Amino acid sequence: PRSTQGLSSAASDVYKRQNLEFKKKYNSKILGSHADRNRIPGIDILLEENQKHKIGNLEFEVIFIPGHTKGHIAFFFKKEKIAFTGDTLFSLGCGRVFEGTHEEMFNSLNKIKNLPPDTKIYCGHEYTNSNLNFCLKYDPKNTHLKDKKINIEKKLNSNQPTIPSTIADEIKTNIF
């Protein structure tokens, strides 16, 4: 099956370019934040906070999470227990505050934190190993973090991805 819709979480230059390439290559619709309607070229379907949308048999809810960018959104697939958090929450870290405020970022991270603990987190970038070293520097006695380091090293040595993480794991190990 081919992709008929692409999800866009933020108005970053990389994502803007990728959205247009995806749209052209797959003749697909792009879904993005209503707040970014004038900033992301090619958005066909505008999404707002708490809105539910279906792609095939999959339904997701839109979570408005400004901070990294003004119109940043996440996609929460409740039935599948999966959240795509873009550049707001990473495994063991969080995105930079480029356009929003630190208060917005803090509130957005708390929204994500309140998802069910077993929710799998898929982030926009893979910075897990460098984020791990940062967290260990500031929380060196965290036994959960030490265990996660062993797990991450095993995965990396086996050429396995370190993503997804879970909400429960991030609460125990992510200093943000």
Locate the predicted segments by residue.
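Short, small-residue-biased leader/transition segments that mark boundaries at the very start
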Residues: 1-15
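Metal-dependent catalytic neighborhoods of phosphoester/phosphodiester hydrolases
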Residues: 16-25, 42-43
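A short helix->loop->beta-strand "cap" motif at the edges of active sites that frequently abuts
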Residues: 26-28, 119
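Short internal beta-strands
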Residues: 28-35
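Catalytic core of the metallo-beta-lactamase
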Residues: 40-139
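Accessory terminal helices/loops
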Residues: 110-120, 129-176
